[in-house]
C-alpha cells in the first residue's frame, strides 16, 4: 500500500470562475470533497503540493488526510483537471473514504525478468495490452502496483488477469472474462519469414494439385 500523506486545505466560501482564478493567483487551486452520503465540501488546496503529487505518480491510488476547518478527512483522489496546454492542475475531486470503504481504482501493472523470457531473448516484443487494471479494493489496502514475472514466456504466449496474483480482498472489476494484460509478440522479421513460408507452402500445394 502507498504511504498516506496530509494535505492542508481552506474552506471555499465562493465558487465560480472568478473565485478559481483568484485562488490560482494566490498559489491554490479549487477542489471538492464528496461521497459518504454527505454534502460536497468546497475547499482550496496548495497548487504546488498537488502538482508534485500528480506528477510524482500514484496520486489516484494513495489515500490522503485533508485537514480543513479543524477536521481531518480521509480521502482518495478520484479525478483532476489539467490545463490543456501547460499540464498545470486546475481542479481536484476527492472521495471521502474510511477503513471500511471499498473503492474502484486503476492500478499499474509492472513486469519483471524480461531477460529470463526466452521469447524476448529471441527478439520477441513485450506487447502491453493494459498498462493498468481496474480493481475493487479496500481503501486502506490499495496496492501500489500489480507485478508479473515473465520468466519462461515464449513468443506467442499471453498474460491473462488470472495469472496475476491479487492481494487478499482485491478483485478485478471485470469479472466476465479472463482478459489479456500482455503478449509476447513475434518480431517483424520473424513474421515476414513465417508469411513467406506459408506463401511458399500454399504455392507448392497448388502445384501438386
Curated annotation (Swiss-Prot):
Lineage: Bacteria, Pseudomonadati, Pseudomonadota, Alphaproteobacteria, Hyphomicrobiales
One term of GO molecular function: 5S rRNA binding
Start-end of Acidic residues biased regions: 200-209
Binding partners and assembly: Part of the 50S ribosomal subunit; part of the 5S rRNA/L5/L18/L25 subcomplex. Contacts the 5S rRNA. Binds to the 5S rRNA independently of L5 and L18.
UniProt cross-references to Gene3D superfamilies, sorted A to Z: Ribosomal protein L25, beta domain, Ribosomal Protein L25, Chain P
A Pfam family recorded for this sequence: Ribosomal_L25p
Chain positions covered by the region annotation Disordered: 190-209
Any GO BP: translation
Gene Ontology cellular component annotations, sorted alphabetically: cytosolic large ribosomal subunit
Protein's recorded name: Large ribosomal subunit protein bL25
Gene this chain is encoded by: rplY
Family according to the record: Belongs to the bacterial ribosomal protein bL25 family. CTC subfamily.
InterPro entries recorded: Rbsml_bL25/Gln-tRNA_synth_N, Ribosomal_bL25/Gln-tRNA_synth, Ribosomal_bL25_b-dom, Ribosomal_bL25_C, Ribosomal_bL25_long, Ribosomal_L25_dom, Ribosomal_uL5_bac-type
RNA-binding as UniProt keyword: yes
Amino acid at each position: 500500500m502507498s504511504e498516506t500523506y496530509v494535505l492542508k486545505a481552506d474552506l471555499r466560501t465562493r465558487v465560480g470562475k472568478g473565485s478559481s482564478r483568484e485562488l490560482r493567483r494566490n498559489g491554490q487551486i479549487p477542489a471538492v470533497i464528496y461521497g459518504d452520503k454527505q454534502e460536497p465540501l468546497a475547499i482550496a488546496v496548495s497548487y504546488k503540493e498537488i502538482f508534485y503529487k500528480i506528477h510524482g505518480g500514484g496520486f489516484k491510488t494513495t489515500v490522503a488526510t485533508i485537514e480543513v476547518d479543524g477536521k481531518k478527512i480521509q480521502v482518495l483522489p478520484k479525478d483532476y483537471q489539467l490545463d490543456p496546454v501547460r499540464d498545470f492542475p486546475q481542479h481536484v475531486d476527492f472521495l471521502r473514504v474510511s477503513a471500511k470503504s471499498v473503492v474502484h481504482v486503476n492500478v499499474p501493472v509492472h513486469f519483471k525478468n524480461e531477460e529470463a523470457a526466452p521469447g524476448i531473448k529471441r527478439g520477441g516484443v513485450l506487447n502491453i495490452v493494459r498498462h493498468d487494471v481496474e480493481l475493487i479494493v479496500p481503501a486502506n489496502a490499495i496496492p501500489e502496483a500489480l507485478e508479473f514475472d515473465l520468466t519462461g514466456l515464449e513468443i506467442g504466449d499471453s498474460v491473462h488477469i488470472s495469472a496475476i496474483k491479487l492481494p487478499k480482498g482485491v478483485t478485478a472489476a471485470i469479472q466476465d472474462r479472463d482478459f489479456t494484460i500482455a503478449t509476447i509478440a513475434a518480431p517483424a522479421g520473424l513474421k515476414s519469414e513465417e508469411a513467406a513460408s506459408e506463401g511458399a507452402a500454399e504455392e507448392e500445394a497448388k502445384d501438386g494439385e
